[in-house]
Swiss-Prot record:
The organism's place on the tree of life at top rank: Eukaryota
Feature type site, description Transition state stabilizer: 170
Keyword Cytoplasm found: yes
Protein name: Aldehyde dehydrogenase 1A1
Regulation: The aminobutyraldehyde dehydrogenase activity is negatively regulated by ethanol in vivo.
Active-site residues from the entry: 269 (proton acceptor), 303 (nucleophile)
Length: 501
């Protein structure tokens, strides 16, 4: 049975007008308490798109108060039927479909994402995830338990309460939906901080949340900076849970703040340095293509990027040759322009960090096969770059680059490559390519990663749990397990006169 056909990709909006730049609390738009605003840039041109209200601790306090009020016993949200929560999530998905062109244009303009990818993959993923979570709303339930004695025992899965959610800049809209979808499905209220680089789609979604009919205070959105607004959420004594997607360094700060405040629940989806292993018996055409997309998709700005390619020595030279040919086919430019398949990095800081790591690869003895520098004289563009003869101790083999840079390493044996693949503090994802079923099962079970793709890469769906081992994070998003991250499990034991089996 074939998958449903993808919708045709229209032209992006030529006259996009930014309507929403304020803080969203209680289904109303607010100026920041401080009166401050911050600029939002187009990374392809380095020009200012607009200025957005800059929330900080005072605004977070207002948002948390609204979220707490909406979560009170007897509130419209707490007394709403679970099936009605599902209906609201489905309505939000329908509104996103209606505004698909606008949202995709905005994501390309503000986030540097190739428009077709934003329209098909990001919006498609958002809508599917919302509908998946909507379907779960009235199916999250406890169990009855046959306890000893004349006791009737059952469990309840209850919403945690007020959830702080801190969104990254690489997939701003998709991560927004991954966060609010399960939280709202389970009956929580949320305070969301979008990344300061990419707040625009979140603020447009706020207007859709109100239009869909969610009660005031259920979703609140406070744009601002991590050290101010993000820190205020993480350390807030009346936030019951914080969920964060971003760097491992910031994840540590959030977990520390949660521990030092009210020991709020924490889920973290953090960095990675994911191995992708190509065995000699693999279909090389498939392996080259998936490995290529695994590291170059969205300019390499993916937490699961296949940033350590291990290739068995007998096919190494051919794999490198084909990978270089593939990388050279990229057309760079404004991501809103048809035919462009690589846009800019998100900002100057990331752009310069990538170029610094590329220089380290050259200095440490890796062979630069193509790329290796800035592209153009305007915008934060980096040439698609491929390194061969990379060794495990090089910085480019150890550090998360988050850019369009492919490292290709050589291996001799299964035992050798498993040991090297696992020799990292990260454990988010891994891939392997082989036609040998025994090898596929053996290696996938040995790899220390939250998701392992076999003969494919970066295949995510709303039904499947996603998250990391080791310093790539705690907890899971998506799937049934992702919903349970937003519930507390309560046991109720009731004395009765007589128990009957």
């Amino acid at each position: 049975m074939s998958s449903p056909a993808q919708p045709a990709v229209p032209a992006p909006l030529a006259d996009l007008k930014i309507q929403h730049t304020k803080i969203f609390i209680n289904n109303e738009w607010h100026n920041s308490v401080s009166g401050k605003k911050f600029p939002v840039l187009n990374p392809a041109t380095e020009e200012v798109i607009c200025h957005v209200e800059e929330g900080d601790k005072a605004d977070v306090d207002k948002a948390v108060k609204a979220a707490r009020q909406a979560f009170q016993i007897g509130s419209p949200w707490r007394t709403m039927d679970a099936s009605e929560r599902g209906r609201l999530l489905n309505k939000l998905a329908d509104l996103m479909e209606r505004d698909r062109l606008l949202l995709a244009t905005m994501e390309a303009l503000n986030g540097g994402k190739v428009f077709a990818n934003a329209y098909l993959s990001d919006l498609g993923g958002c809508i599917k995830a919302l509908k998946y979570c909507a379907g779960w709303a009235d199916k999250i339930h406890g169990q009855t338990i046959p306890s000893d004695g004349d006791i009737f025992t059952y469990t309840r899965r209850e919403p945690i309460g007020v959830c702080g959610q801190i969104i990254p800049w690489n997939f701003p809209m998709l991560m927004f939906i991954w966060k609010i979808g399960p939280a709202l499905s389970c009956g929580n209220t949320v305070v969301v901080k979008p990344a300061e680089q990419t707040p625009l789609t979140a603020l447009h979604l706020a207007s859709l949340i109100k239009e869909a009919g969610f009660p005031p205070g259920v979703v609140n959105i406070v744009p601002g900076y991590g050290p101010t607004a993000g820190a205020a959420i993480s350390s807030h004594m009346d936030v019951d849970k914080v969920a964060f997607t971003g760097s491992t360094q910031v994840g540590k700060l959030i977990k520390e703040a949660a521990g030092k405040s009210n020991l709020k629940r924490v889920t973290l989806e953090l960095g990675g340095k994911s191995p992708c292993i190509v065995f000699a018996d693999a279909d090389l055409d498939i392996a080259v293509e998936f490995a290529h997309h695994g590291v170059f998709y969205h300019q390499g700005q993916c937490c699961v990027a296949a940033s350590r390619i291990f290739v068995e020595e007998s096919v190494y030279d051919e794999f490198v040759k084909r990978s270089v040919e593939r990388a050279k086919k990229y057309v760079l430019g404004n991501p809103l322009t048809p035919g462009i398949n690589q846009g800019p990095q998100i900002d100057k800081e990331q752009h310069d960090k990538i170029l610094d790591l590329i220089e380290s690869g050259k200095k440490e003895g890796a062979k630069l096969e193509c790329g290796g520098g800035r592209w153009g004289n305007k915008g934060f563009f980096v040439q698609p770059t491929v390194f061969s003869n990379v060794t495990d101790e090089m910085r480019i083999a150890k550090e998360e680059i988050f850019g369009p840079v492919q490292q290709i390493m050589k291996f001799k044996s299964v035992d050798d490559v498993i040991k090297r693949a696992n020799n990292t503090t990260y454990g988010l994802a891994a891939g392997l390519f082989t036609k040998d079923l025994d090898k596929a099962i053996t290696v996938s079970s040995a790899l220390q990663a939250g998701v392992v793709w076999v003969n494919c890469y970066m295949m995510l769906s709303a039904q499947c749990p996603f998250g990391g081992f080791k310093m790539s994070g705690n907890g899971r998003e998506l799937g049934e397990h992702g919903l349970y991250e937003y519930t507390e499990l309560k046991t109720v034991a009731m004395k009765i006169s007589q128990k009957n089996s």
